[in-house]
């Protein structure tokens, strides 16, 4: 049983009855689920994950004080704290993890302010441009078990829909970094006798390539620890995971370097094919830099288009 399944089972066994019996007037106002930080919200938790922050628990998200006053929130917190301390052989933690409590009673506005800087999830263009994909994933990942009002569901749905101009700006910046690091600087660093710098170039190529692949899939990239696991599950370009892993985990002697450069070019070609499939580029070549500027040229908002191409990276 993974964390999401554990959370739902704990809620159904104890949380739902607690709400129904002790807070019947709040049942339709409270959104319940497991959302926010943690591998369990992504379905990536495994046996290793159980050594920290793994416990039966769920989130109770309250509307503003006009609908749920402070006293009600306090009573709900106290009732949640009194739920069984152990469930299915797993104990609930008595202390909050680093970064604050992940379960229990939260205000909707506080949750979304912490994750994306907006209590209602309505972001400015600049916020969209600057927010890390991980922050957007934490705001939209996990699962809601109940949301009668639909308010949290609506906010999460809006945050999943990155504006197209923003997606293009992010793509353009990372495509340019892929070109600089992989297609241009990798072999040049080796010719300069700088193998460590060459590996840094590989790292930059891989990091930006992963950002591009998630953007092309219209989904958000997770914390780097889970990036490869998430990459392998994507519907498009999932096979790049194997190539990128090889680039990161092999050396840079002369024979390997030529092979790795061929892989960089092959990966670039796959990315370009998908850019063309989505109508994002008008360039016709294998140079990712030219495609980066073509993607940027396709941004409709002149203010966003005219920002430095690396503004989002």
Predicted regions and their residues:
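Hydrophobic, Leu/Ile/Phe/Ala-enriched alpha-helical segments that form helix-helix packing faces
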Residues: 15-23, 76-84, 271, 275
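Basic, alpha-helical terminal appendages of large translation-related enzymes
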Residues: 1-2, 67-68, 264
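Conserved NTP/Mg2+-binding pocket subregion across the NTase superfamily
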Residues: 69-190
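Active-site nucleotide-donor binding segment shared across nucleotidyl transfer reactions
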Residues: 20-65
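Conserved nucleotidyltransferase catalytic core and NTase-mimicking acidic/glycine-rich helix/loop elements
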Residues: 134-305, 310-313
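Ligand-binding pocket scaffold of soluble enzyme catalytic domains
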Residues: 42-46, 57-59, 86-90, 194, ...
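Helical scaffold of the NTase/Pol beta-like nucleotidyltransferase catalytic core
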Residues: 1-33
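A generic structural motif
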Residues: 62-67, 192-196
């Amino acid at each position: 049983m993974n964390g999401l399944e554990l959370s739902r089972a704990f809620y159904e066994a104890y949380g739902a009855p607690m709400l129904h019996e002790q807070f019947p007037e709040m049942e339709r106002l409270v959104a319940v689920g497991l959302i926010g930080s943690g591998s369990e919200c992504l379905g990536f938790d495994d046996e290793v994950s159980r050594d920290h922050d793994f416990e039966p628990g769920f989130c109770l998200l309250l509307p503003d004080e006009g609908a749920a006053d402070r006293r009600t929130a306090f009573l709900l917190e106290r009732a949640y704290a009194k739920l069984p301390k152990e469930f299915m052989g797993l104990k609930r933690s008595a202390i909050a993890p680093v970064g604050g409590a992940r379960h229990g009673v939260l205000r909707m506005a506080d949750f979304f302010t912490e994750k994306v800087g907006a209590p209602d999830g309505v972001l400015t263009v600049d916020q969209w441009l600057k927010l890390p994909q991980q922050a957007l994933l934490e705001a939209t990942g996990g699962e809601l078990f109940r949301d009668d009002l639909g308010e949290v569901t609506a906010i999460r749905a809006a945050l999943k829909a990155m504006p197209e101009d923003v997606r293009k700006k992010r793509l353009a910046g990372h495509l340019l970094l892929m070109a600089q690091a992989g297609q241009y600087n990798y072999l040049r660093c080796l010719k300069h006798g700088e193998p460590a710098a060459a590996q840094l170039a590989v790292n930059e190529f891989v990091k930006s390539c992963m950002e591009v692949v998630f953007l092309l899939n219209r989904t958000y990239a997770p914390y780097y620890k889970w990036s490869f696991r998430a990459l392998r599950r994507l519907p498009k370009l999932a096979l790049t995971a194997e190539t990128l892993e090889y680039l990161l985990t092999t050396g840079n002697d002369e024979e390997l370097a030529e092979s790795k450069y061929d892989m960089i070019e092959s990966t670039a070609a796959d990315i370009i094919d998908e850019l063309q499939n989505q109508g994002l580029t008008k360039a016709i070549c294998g140079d990712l830099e030219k495609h980066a500027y073509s993607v940027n040229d396709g941004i409709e908002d002149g203010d966003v288009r005219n920002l430095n191409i690396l503004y989002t990276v």
